[in-house]
Regions:
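A short, surface-exposed loop/turn module that caps and links secondary-structure elements
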Residues: 34-61
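Enriched for short, Lys/Arg-rich terminal
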Residues: 2-5, 9-31, 45, 58-66, ...
């Protein structure tokens, strides 16, 4: 089942940052987003981790950056894609 993906305003700003600063990281984020859309919130690459305080999940982009998201109905809402999560 394909899930729709939306970005919070902060997450969109993060995404635009990667577009201009680091194409390798952007490519990794795009791969994570494609897998989230195709396979859902838990499966795929990036080591999904349940976050307690924000009732969301994160996947590892690289050693310091995380893709943080929540699932609402059939939609995945990206909360951030730059920096560590704040759990």
């Amino acid at each position: 089942m394909a899930h729709s993906i939306t970005f919070s305003p902060d997450a969109w700003a993060d995404y635009l940052y990667w577009q201009s600063e680091d194409k390798k990281t952007l490519k990794r984020i795009n791969k994570l987003l494609q897998e989230l859309q195709r396979d859902g919130a838990v499966q795929g690459i990036g080591k999904a981790e349940l976050l307690r305080k924000i009732k969301g999940m994160s996947k590892r982009i690289d050693d310091t950056n995380r893709l943080v998201y929540t699932v609402e109905n059939d939609s995945i809402v990206v909360l951030s894609c730059r920096g560590p999560y704040e759990d």
